[in-house]
């Protein structure tokens, strides 16, 4: 503790109270964004609460700390050079604004979802402020390749070790060293799979290297992933599924969280259970008793018909609630609002 107490302020994690001059803010009520619900819910795996209500992580190859009050989102940026110690620039604030997609009104979306779905209305009362991040497609792709048959804690560890081994070193704060996300060439290197296995990625190591090589050698590089942002949802989903280690669920995660496809509904065991338990949903096109490609597509259509073009965002609210308070959902299947359209599978 003595060592940490003597670190210069430029080498320590900041808090809003300890260095207010180095922070800037964006008007943003908690009903539009709850950092604790968004940054620790399995969207990104690179944010940690380093001090109470202060979240630190890497965004756009810079290290940030975020916190919030009832009506403001605060941020500070560590640039790695004492001569550049200053509050975030307008450009950096714009980066944060785009990352949280703050141009999308959660109030309007929640109001619509509650008007057509009584179950959502009940759950949302305690889970305001859940929104989708707009992540870098490369980081999102390889993070979710690591998510196969995994949980949030283990995925977080895998992604962190991957960044430490293959990503550029950015800065050390207290006893934490931050790294940027690796580029495709680093992940496609001849020794990458062996190294990734030693880091605990298991069979996913082969998929990480193979997908990096496929993008570089068959698709022309990272620009291909960026171009999928403007492709139709079905086209982008199909293209992602050609990559090693990317199935329908992982492709939907990438579409939703990195490729501007808010209608994408990733289906895993949690979402399947929510649909079965809280909506009385059963697949009509297959006999599947759990997630499968055909049944997952049917379930995605069910939720898209119910919630509309931002169905993936609504699903994220229920997913976040189910992770934290599954008892909220242990009631008879939801009744739709009188007069609302009954979705079809």
Swiss-Prot record:
Top-rank taxon, per record: Eukaryota
Catalytic residues, chain numbering: 249 (schiff-base intermediate with dna)
Function: DNA repair enzyme that incises DNA at 8-oxoG residues. Excises 7,8-dihydro-8-oxoguanine and 2,6-diamino-4-hydroxy-5-N-methylformamidopyrimidine (FAPY) from damaged DNA. Has a beta-lyase activity that nicks DNA 3' to the lesion.
Protein name: N-glycosylase/DNA lyase
Principal location: nucleus
Binding residues for DNA: 149, 154, 204, 270, 287
InterPro entries, sorted: DNA_glycosylase (IPR011257), HhH-GPD_domain (IPR003265), HhH_base_excis_C (IPR023170), Ogg1 (IPR004577), OGG_N (IPR012904), Oxidative_DNA_repair_enzyme (IPR052054)
GO CC terms of this entry: mitochondrion; nuclear matrix; nuclear speck; nucleoplasm; nucleus; protein-containing complex
Reactions catalysed: 2'-deoxyribonucleotide-(2'-deoxyribose 5'-phosphate)-2'-deoxyribonucleotide-DNA = a 3'-end 2'-deoxyribonucleotide-(2,3-dehydro-2,3-deoxyribose 5'-phosphate)-DNA + a 5'-end 5'-phospho-2'-deoxyribonucleoside-DNA + H(+)
PANTHER family with a match to the protein in the record: 8-OXOGUANINE DNA GLYCOSYLASE, N-GLYCOSYLASE_DNA LYASE
Listed GO biological process terms: base-excision repair; cellular response to reactive oxygen species; DNA damage response; DNA repair; negative regulation of double-strand break repair via single-strand annealing; nucleotide-excision repair; positive regulation of gene expression via chromosomal CpG island demethylation; positive regulation of transcription by RNA polymerase II
Cellular compartment(s): Nucleus, Nucleoplasm; Nucleus speckle; Nucleus matrix
Residues binding 8-oxoguanine, per UniProt: 266, 268, 315, 319
Tissue distribution: Highest expression in testis.
E.C. designation(s): 3.2.2.-, 4.2.99.18
Pfam families: HhH-GPD (PF00730), OGG_N (PF07934)
Family: Belongs to the type-1 OGG1 family.
GO molecular function, one term: oxidized base lesion DNA N-glycosylase activity
UniProt keyword list: DNA damage, DNA repair, Glycosidase, Hydrolase, Lyase, Multifunctional enzyme, Nucleus
